[in-house]
């Protein structure tokens, strides 16, 4: 594996796409300081995955992108590509099969960094994996930059161990150990989290158990509280209805009293209206008299104002006449002055017009001469520009031909080198095995068919499993439902049986029965079976006889006369069977509704029930009671008894109430339990079958999935083998064809380049002669053009001066004309104003003659007499109005008193209405609450006892609420959460065990990796130490050196260098000179190379601190090691340059831009010498 070429674009100073070959084993890079040589080393380190900008001599990673120069803009991306010849297959991983490997990295300004391998997107990790164990990497010992030699020899022991590990090739072991430690760390963290969760879950389970108890108590309290609250609502609703009725009656009484008071008010209002009409009439008369007085006063005022106006008008007209005479004299004087100024202005305009005409003629003459001069100037300039363009074209042609010659030389050299490489590569190509490829394809087809079959079976199994799972869940749900149903029926049956048992064994009568040993006797009700619905009717008729005890002879009951039972008790003895009594008419007897198996018992019931008949309801019984025989009775389903002369309403008042109904229900429930048990057994059998089918399908799915995975893995493996061989065959065919075509193309290109170079030399000579002729002619034309340009400039200046003089003259003439027009307008205005003032003067004199005061004084005396008469009439009208106003005020006060008496009544009615409305709203509120709760009010009323008070119910609700509040926060989902938490704890316990096993497995793997790494490192240390001891004397001409381990454990111990040149006994290497340190570091690096030679090595001015003798020894050692390792070195030393097989020159002719140039070996040596 060797480096064959490097491509750079936009990386640091290599802004243009640059591609240079690395053909030999010793390639030197030369050039002046600062031209960008070290950027090549940075580029290689960068593309191998370097992520620290400081290692690339920058502050941020964007610094590797070209940042612009004085003539170029900054670049937007940087790209570096390394092309390796992998014909020996040394590359690691899947890329080892490729003969050529191209590693590429691209970085853009937005920070996006991309890696590619053979133009396929890859990760940074993938690129590093290729070079694991080869000594290559962003900071490996195979890339030695400026100052790195000193850092190696002066590195800390722990840092120096890193180079030893790279030489040993344990990078992959360390990577595996790091990944294993990461997984171990993650597993331990997961185990810790699981254990924390388990502990937390255990505490949570205890809380949930306590919460479940509280939730059950909470439900009981809530149910009791809801019942008490609804009873309270119903009681409040009834009280609100009663209060509403009381308030309605009070409102009616108050309304009657209000109507009486209102009638009195209407009488007072009628009297008030009569007085108000009279008052309106008197008020109108008074207002008429006052209006007449106002008119008389107005006439007096008008005449007085008229007299005052006449006097003021006479004075005003006299003043106006005097002012108009003065204005008339002023306008006449202004017209005379303007006429004199007009004559002077006309003379000035004539002079200005004459001067303007002369100046315009001079300016026109100068402008007419300019076009000819300008045309000559433009012709001369065009000719001069054409000459300049031809010179520039000729110079460009010369440069182009020179570049063509250099390019042709470079192309010829590169083509010849590539021709030789292609010949060598063609001879080393190996044809792939066709038979093996065909065999792999047949195996692949066979396994793909097997995979398709397995995938089909897997799809069928995956499709069937959800269906079976649904069937299984449905079966289990049915089992649960049937079990719940049977449990419910059994619980109901047990409750009824217990109730029946309690009825028999509890109460006042039982101790008496036990005392007389009668407790074992059968009760009557156990032998009776009544038609459904008539149980209560039979109980109402038989009453205490329903629990009668059967005895063989009634005579011995006489013994209980002295020791009577504490409650009613009946005995019966079955007589001889008799015929039942016939029912009169259409009456239905009760006895046929009772099913009795015992004939003797039937005779007893015939005696007790012979005259008892049934009716559907109480109304029917009452209607037909006269049809009853003597001593007969009707009984209805509700238990009410109707005789010919009375009605007995039934109520449960004994312990035996409802025993027949309960017995009937017990019998029905017993049958239902047996039927439900059969259904439950059937559901359990179906669930077992469904569970077995699901388990079988699940196992089959697991087996089919495993088969499909094995088939998939085998198919993938065969696909990779086929792909490798196919790609190898394609690469062989493609590369063979490509080499043949390239060789033909290169031969043609070589001939073409030679012909182009000869043609370029001829063109260069021709263009050189043309350039000399053009430059001579250009100098002559340049002088003639400068003279013409000066003449044209002077002519333009003189024309501009003449034009300015003409412009000034025209402006003076226009000013004179404007002055004349203005004076004419002033004269016309003065005449017009004088005429207008004369007309106004005539009008004012005529107005003065029309003014007369005597007529106005006579009219004023008459108006004063009329006003006095109007004042007397107004006084009489005002006296009449004041009298009516006093009467109207008295009547209005009476009306107000009546209205004030009405207001308390209205307030009382309003208050009563508010109370009635409040009662109605309260009732509606409680009715709405009952409706919202969907309460059956009829059933609720039966629970409402007469002695229940709202305070009692409110106290009960408060007590229950306090009990609920005392429970604190209640988790209603505690029961469900408890089941879920228990199930989760079982799962977490299993997961904790799995994680513990995984930790043990990972720890075993780490111990195995450490064991292998320790052995490999020890062997490497011994081997490097041996090579180091051999190479050090070769570079120094004697002396000794060795490596020392600073610790007992090689995995974490440091490495220290001990070096003593000939004749020195120094204790540490820090006492050596700079050159000695450099040689020591070089010996150490090359010792690592001999152990694990890297494909190539980059040296950046490593020989800088060495003198000529040491440089010679260094060069000899590098030359000897180049048999196994390719060296690319940067140097300014002539001795180092001489050992190179090829030289690559780096130049910076354009500031800030690096380019690659061909370098002659002798020129380079002379450059280094200078």
UniProtKB/Swiss-Prot annotation:
This is Chromosome partition protein Smc. It holds the Pfam family SMC_hinge. One of its GO terms (biological process) is DNA replication. Required for chromosome condensation and partitioning. Residues 169-215, 245-365, 401-508, 664-944, 983-1020 form a coiled coil. GO terms for molecular function: ATP binding; ATP hydrolysis activity; DNA binding. The gene is smc. Keywords: ATP-binding, Coiled coil, Cytoplasm, DNA-binding, Nucleotide-binding. InterPro entries: P-loop_NTPase (IPR027417), RecF/RecN/SMC_N (IPR003395), SMC (IPR024704), SMC_hinge (IPR010935), SMC_hinge_sf (IPR036277), SMC_prok (IPR011890). Contains large globular domains required for ATP hydrolysis at each terminus and a third globular domain forming a flexible SMC hinge near the middle of the molecule. These domains are separated by coiled-coil structures. GO terms for cellular component: chromosome; cytoplasm. ATP binds at residues 32-39. It comes from Burkholderia pseudomallei (strain 1710b). Homodimer. Gene3D superfamilies: 1.20.1060.20, 3.30.70.1620, P-loop containing nucleotide triphosphate hydrolases. Belongs to the SMC family. It is found in: Cytoplasm. SUPFAM superfamilies: P-loop containing nucleoside triphosphate hydrolases (SSF52540), Smc hinge domain (SSF75553), Tropomyosin (SSF57997). CDD domains: ABC_SMC_barmotin (cd03278). The keyword Chloroplast does not apply. Residues 520-623 form the SMC hinge domain.
């Amino acid at each position: 594996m060797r480096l064959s070429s490097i491509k750079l674009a936009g990386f640091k100073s290599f802004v243009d796409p640059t591609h240079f070959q690395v053909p030999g084993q010793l390639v030197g890079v030369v050039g002046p300081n600062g031209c960008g040589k070290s950027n090549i080393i940075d580029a290689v380190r960068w593309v191998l995955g370097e992520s620290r900008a400081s290692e690339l001599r920058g502050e941020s990673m964007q610094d590797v992108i070209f940042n612009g120069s004085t003539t170029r803009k900054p670049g937007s991306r940087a790209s570096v590509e390394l092309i390796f010849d992998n014909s020996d297959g040394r590359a690691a991983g899947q890329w080892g099969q490729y003969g050529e490997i191209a590693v590429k990295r691209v970085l853009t300004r937005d920070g996006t960094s991309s890696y590619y391998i053979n133009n396929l997107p890859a990760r940074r990790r993938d690129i590093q994996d290729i070079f694991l164990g080869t000594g290559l990497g962003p900071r490996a010992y195979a890339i030695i930059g400026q100052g790195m030699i000193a850092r190696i020899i002066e590195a800390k022991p722990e840092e120096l161990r890193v180079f030893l590990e790279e030489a040993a090739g344990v990078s992959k072991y360390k990577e595996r150990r790091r990944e294993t430690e990461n997984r171990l760390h993650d597993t331990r963290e997961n185990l810790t989290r699981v254990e924390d969760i388990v502990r937390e879950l255990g505490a949570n389970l205890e809380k949930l158990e306590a919460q479940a108890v509280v939730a059950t108590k909470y439900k009981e309290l809530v149910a009791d509280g809801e019942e008490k609250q609804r009873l309270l609502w119903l009681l409040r609703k009834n009280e609100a209805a009663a209060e509403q009725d009381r308030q309605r009656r009070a409102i009616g009484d108050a309304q009657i009293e209000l109507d009486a008071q209102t009638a009195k008010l209407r009488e007072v209002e009628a009297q008030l209206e009569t007085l108000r009409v009279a008052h309106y009439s008197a008020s109108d008369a008074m207002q008429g008299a006052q209006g007449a007085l106002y008119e008389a006063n107005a006439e007096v005022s008008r005449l007085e104002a008229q007299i005052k106006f006449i006097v003021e008008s006479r004075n005003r007209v006299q003043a106006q006449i005097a002012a108009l005479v003065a204005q008339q004299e002023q306008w006449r004087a202004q017209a005379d002055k303007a006429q004199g100024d007009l004559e002077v202005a006309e003379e000035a305009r004539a002079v200005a017009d004459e001067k303007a005409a002369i100046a315009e003629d001079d300016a026109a003459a100068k402008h007419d001469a300019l076009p000819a001069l300008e045309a000559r100037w433009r012709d001369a300039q065009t000719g001069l520009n054409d000459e300049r363009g031809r010179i520039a074209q000729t110079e460009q042609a010369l440069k182009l031909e020179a570049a063509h010659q250099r390019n042709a030389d470079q192309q010829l050299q590169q083509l010849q080198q590539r021709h030789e490489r292609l010949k060598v590569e063609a001879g080393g190509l190996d044809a792939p095995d066709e038979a093996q490829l065909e065999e792999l394809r047949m195996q692949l087809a066979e396994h793909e068919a097997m995979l398709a079959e397995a995938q089909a079976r897997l799809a069928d199994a995956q499709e069937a499993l959800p269906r079976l799972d649904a069937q299984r869940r449905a079966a289990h749900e049915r089992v649960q439902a049937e079990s719940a149903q049977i449990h419910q029926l059994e619980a109901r049956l047990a409750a009824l049986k217990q109730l029946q048992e309690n009825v028999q064994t509890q109460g006042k009568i039982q101790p008496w029965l036990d005392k007389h040993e009668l407790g074992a006797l059968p009760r009557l009700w156990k032998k009776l079976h009544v038609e459904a619905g008539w149980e209560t009717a039979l109980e109402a008729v038989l009453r205490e006889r329903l629990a009668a005890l059967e005895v063989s002879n009634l005579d011995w009951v006489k013994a209980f006369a002295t020791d009577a039972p504490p409650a009613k008790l009946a005995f019966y003895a079955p007589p001889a069977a008799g015929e039942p009594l016939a029912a009169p008419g259409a009456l239905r007897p009760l006895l046929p509704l009772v099913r009795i198996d015992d004939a003797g018992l039937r005779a007893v019931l015939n005696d007790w029930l012979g005259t008892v008949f049934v009716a559907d309801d109480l109304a029917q019984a009452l209607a037909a009671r006269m049809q009853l025989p003597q001593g007969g009775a009707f009984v209805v389903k509700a238990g009410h008894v109707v005789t010919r002369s009375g009605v007995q309403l039934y109520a449960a008042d004994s312990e035996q109430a409802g025993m027949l109904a309960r017995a009937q229900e017990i019998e029905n429930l017993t049958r239902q339990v047996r039927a439900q048990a059969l259904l439950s057994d059937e559901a359990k059998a179906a669930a077992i079958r469904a569970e077995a089918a699901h388990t079988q399908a699940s196992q089959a799915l697991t087996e089919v999935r495993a088969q499909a995975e094995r088939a998939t893995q085998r198919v993938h493996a065969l696909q990779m083998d086929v792909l490798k061989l196919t790609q190898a065959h394609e690469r062989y065919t493609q590369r063979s064809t490509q080499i043949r075509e390239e060789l033909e193309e290169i031969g043609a290109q070589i001939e073409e380049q030679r012909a182009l170079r000869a043609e370029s030399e001829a063109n260069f000579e021709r263009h050189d002669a043309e350039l000399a002729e053009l430059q001579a002619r250009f100098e002559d034309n340049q002088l003639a053009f400068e003279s013409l340009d000066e003449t044209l400039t002077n002519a333009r200046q003189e024309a501009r001066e003449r034009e300015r003089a003409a412009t000034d003259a025209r402006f003076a003439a226009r000013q004179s004309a404007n002055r004349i027009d203005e004076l004419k307008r002033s004269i016309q205005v003065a005449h017009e104003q004088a005429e207008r003032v004369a007309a106004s003067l005539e009008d004012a004199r005529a107005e003065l003659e029309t003014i007369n005061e005597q007529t106005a004084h006579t009219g004023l005396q008459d108006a004063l007499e009329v006003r006095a008469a109007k004042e007397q009439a107004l006084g009489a009208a005002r006296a009449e109005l004041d009298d009516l106003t006093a009467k109207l005020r008295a009547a209005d006060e009476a009306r107000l008193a009546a209205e004030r008496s009405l207001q308390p009544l209205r307030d009382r009615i309003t208050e009563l209405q508010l109370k009635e409305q409040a009662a109605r709203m309260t009732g509606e509120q409680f009715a709405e609450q009952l409706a919202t709760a969907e309460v059956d009010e009829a059933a609720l009323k039966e629970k409402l006892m007469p002695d229940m008070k709202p305070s009692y119910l409110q106290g009960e609700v408060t007590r229950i609420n306090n009990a609920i509040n005392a429970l604190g926060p209640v988790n209603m989902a505690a029961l469900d959460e408890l089941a879920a938490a228990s199930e989760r704890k079982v799962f977490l316990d299993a997961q904790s065990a799995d994680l513990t096993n995984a930790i043990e497995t990972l720890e075993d793997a780490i111990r195995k990796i450490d064991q292998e790494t320790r052995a490999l490192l020890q062997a490497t240390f011994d081997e490097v130490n041996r090579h180091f001891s051999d190479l050090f004397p070769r570079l120094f001409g004697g002396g000794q050196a060795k490596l020392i381990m600073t610790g007992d454990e090689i995995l974490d111990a440091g490495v220290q260098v001990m070096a003593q040149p000939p004749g020195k006994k120094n204790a540490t290497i820090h006492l050596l000179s700079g050159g000695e340190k450099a040689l020591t570091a070089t010996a150490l690096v090359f010792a690592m190379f001999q152990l694990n030679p890297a494909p190539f090595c980059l040296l950046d001015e490593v020989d800088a601190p060495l003198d000529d003798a040491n440089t010679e020894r260094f060069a000899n050692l590098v030359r000897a090691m180049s048999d196994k390792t390719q060296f690319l070195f940067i140097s300014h030393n002539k001795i180092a340059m001489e050992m190179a097989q090829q030289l690559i020159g780096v130049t910076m002719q354009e500031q800030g831009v690096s380019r690659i140039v061909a370098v002659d070996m002798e020129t380079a040596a002379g450059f280094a010498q200078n």
